[in-house]
Swiss-Prot record:
Protein name: Cydiastatin-7
Lineage: Eukaryota, Metazoa, Ecdysozoa, Arthropoda, Hexapoda
Keywords attached to this entry: Amidation, Neuropeptide, Secreted
GO biological process assignments: neuropeptide signaling pathway
GO cellular component terms given for this protein: extracellular region
Leucine amide PTM positions: 7
Keyword Signal part of the UniProt annotation: no
Length: 7
C-alpha cells in the first residue's frame, strides 16, 4: 500500500 504506517 501507499499508506502502510500500521495505524
Amino acid at each position: 500500500k501507499m499508506y502502510d504506517f500500521g495505524l
